[in-house]
């Protein structure tokens, strides 16, 4: 979620040039005012231009989906892309689908309800996206129509999502059952989230897409495994692959 740190790792620590970096969600869009992110872009534009790098953001559950329409956050070197965006780079065709369930959503809703009056009284709403800590449209969506349209023009070899198919780790987020004690719909919603990824995978398989890599975040840990010819890679916070 820290754009400065991301650019530092990309351009200074790893000294990467001519590189497209795709962030697999939880960029932090929406916790601050829009102006904050615009400032980040201005602060890092020169460094990104000099290295000829780009960063594409896929939405996580710690992001306001309003930023991911392809226009709200769209700069020369930084863009937050809509679900079902296709990226073509370095001879790869990459499908991006964001979204996941926040297991701590009840806590975040309550926390916001405590804070919101104090926060909103200081904010001008004109041309701004209101801050929040939780967005109810955070879940991933399976869109068969978009997949069918994509299948006409593209052969996907790489997938970037925030969560993962149900046969991938982690099989359960830590403390999930604890959070579920006060959130009766949580376990079902989390299961549905993974099933959406299963449907995505199924669609790619039955349409003979040569998928070889699938990258995801969400679980704040590192793991990888080759399953049925696809290398699944779970990325930790700020982990590059």
Name these PLM-found stretches.
Residues 27-30, 62-64, 99-103, 163-168, ...:
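Short, solvent-exposed loop/turn segments at secondary-structure junctions
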Residues 2, 85, 99, 138, ...:
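Adenosine-cofactor binding site in Rossmann-like domains, unifying the SAM/SAH pocket
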Residues 54-58, 73, 167-241:
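Conserved beta-sheet core of the metallophosphoesterase superfamily
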Residues 3-90, 178-180, 186, 190-196, ...:
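Core catalytic region of metal-dependent phosphoesterases/phosphodiesterases
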Residues 6, 32-33, 66-69, 106, ...:
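Short glycine-/acidic-enriched loop or helix-start segments at secondary-structure transitions
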Residues 92-195:
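Active-site-proximal loop/helix segment associated with metal-binding centers of metalloenzymes
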Residues 86-96, 158, 226-232:
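Beta-strand-turn-beta hairpins that frame and shape the catalytic cleft
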